[in-house]
């Protein structure tokens, strides 16, 4: 009878008490696990912050140019919150080291740019795939190649655009210091162009003494297109059709330029075959293109005539090359030297390069470390972008422009009066050339080049298409301090 009695609520209350008793350890365990996770996260972030600080003292392993935009502030998976880099397409990054498969450590090449975490190509590819999946789920037609849009482009055009998008990597490996290349006022190999560029070379050598390497390049760098160097079939075709520069020679020159740039010194190329910015647009050099511009065609004609009959015979081709350069959009060049006075042109170029120097050299925390490092170890983590860069011997001294009395005389030639007309400028250039610099490209007597074609043939065959509107430029002064 007692066993059959029922007390309402007894079993429920006892069961509830048991539940509450057994749930307390579970709740405490969840809190403890959460605290452990937070503690581990803080420890990982602290270690990442320490590695970030240590990277400030490490040399630049390699550099890349970006093909996409990225905002590190919005990336919650950054190892240290708020320490991700922000960059736009066509920016330049110095990579210090690899942190993980998803992250590198480096800095944006910009004055005042600090060390930060940089997403690796794998990380950016993962982000891109997530965005595509999200777009498909939301049914956004613009993200799906305009599927279902009546005004969608023809299949061939759409397929071409898709193919281009698929083959654009997030980063292109470039030299750690962008090489400086002079073009204009006309064709290299003729006296007027050679003497004007020689005066600038001499100025740069003395102005940036100890911080600059000026080297001559005879190989045809226009053959160093990424699509050619990475495609054995194209390499064979070009090697058969070009007697002047084999692809192997061009590849060797490219590697030498990369090697020069590793020292983080300014690199200036005296490139025999480069007369137009389009020739280097698709290479991995990412050069700083400097246009030495004569104010008017009449001034250039007068300069050419002053060099004698041997130069007058080639007046037409030189003027055609001048017209080709003048027709380029300003965005094709990083610097346009259109000053009438040589001193002003030199200072213009020097100020631009000083800004670039500060942008590429992160200020050291210790005092007295203003100069460039005397020796930089070899490239680190080369496998990160799948690039194989071989170590080379120390820089060849004979490849650099020698410091001689001629250079000193050239420097003195433009340190005179600051008030000069075009006529006086012409006389300065003529004297500098006559006394200091004999033409080295074998065109002053009208002789063809080694492959039987004059350089202007290659220049005039260039496309009128200029796909390098990504360069920094301002109409009056193309060296803004905030451009890096």
Curated annotation (Swiss-Prot):
One GO term of the biological process aspect: calcium ion transmembrane transport
One Pfam family from the record: VGCC_beta4Aa_N
Main localization of the protein described in the UniProt heading: cytoplasm
Keyword Transport assigned: yes
Subcellular location: Cytoplasm
Gene Ontology CC annotation, any one: plasma membrane
Renumbered residue ranges of the record's region Disordered: 1-52, 129-170, 390-484
Keyword Cell division: no
Molecular function as annotated in GO: calcium channel regulator activity; high voltage-gated calcium channel activity
Alphabetical UniProt keywords: Calcium, Calcium channel, Calcium transport, Cytoplasm, Ion channel, Ion transport, Phosphoprotein, SH3 domain, Transport, Voltage-gated channel
Compositional bias (Basic and acidic residues): 390-399, 463-484
Tissue: Detected in the inner plexiform layer in the retina (at protein level).
Polar residues bias spans: 409-420
Modified residues annotated as Phosphoserine in this record: 152, 393
Family statement drawn from the similarity comment of this UniProt entry: Belongs to the calcium channel beta subunit family.
Summary of subunit composition and partner proteins: Component of a calcium channel complex consisting of a pore-forming alpha subunit (CACNA1C) and the ancillary subunits CACNB3 and CACNA2D1. The channel complex contains alpha, beta, gamma and delta subunits in a 1:1:1:1 ratio. Interacts with CACNA2D4. Interacts with FASLG. Interacts with CBARP; prevents the interaction of CACNB3 with the alpha subunit CACNA1C thereby negatively regulating the activity of the corresponding calcium channel.
Protein role: Regulatory subunit of the voltage-gated calcium channel that gives rise to L-type calcium currents. Increases CACNA1B peak calcium current and shifts the voltage dependencies of channel activation and inactivation. Increases CACNA1C peak calcium current and shifts the voltage dependencies of channel activation and inactivation.
Protein name: Voltage-dependent L-type calcium channel subunit beta-3
Source organism (scientific name): Mus musculus
Native organism taxonomy: Eukaryota, Metazoa, Chordata, Craniata, Vertebrata
